[in-house]
Swiss-Prot record:
Signal peptide: none annotated. GO terms for biological process: translation. HAMAP family: Ribosomal_uS12_B. Keywords: Methylation, Ribonucleoprotein, Ribosomal protein, RNA-binding, rRNA-binding, tRNA-binding. One of its GO terms (cellular component) is small ribosomal subunit. This is Small ribosomal subunit protein uS12. It comes from Sulfurihydrogenibium sp. (strain YO3AOP1).
Amino acid sequence: MPTINQLVRKGREKVEKKSKAPALQGNPQKRGVCVRVYTTTPKKPNSALRKVARVRLSNGYEVTCYIPGIGHNLQEHSIVLVRGGRVKDLPGVRYKIIRGALDAAGVKDRKQSRSKYGAKRPKPGQAAATTGKKK
């Protein structure tokens, strides 16, 4: 344990916290170009084909991004907006593509949590006809 005199002379060393999304360089989002769009399988207890894309960001970094929602229109050379946010069952995937921005279309026929998937508000008359629920 240091003496008061030692603390006055040197002070405490600050512990810098490590960024969870270093490729964004402190920005909320970054633009990038899809280099490869493919599916991959999740870690042990889960089973699925998760849609992911390898994206080259505008700052030169190349990252693996998750494509959220059901169905997508992304292919090689698509321009996408990338945000932070990991996918727990996909090792090495620490970023997500923002749906409804740039070349990534919003999820079709999405009724709930629309803002997260870039889906527009359904027309009032159409909504009642398409939902399968009774009142």
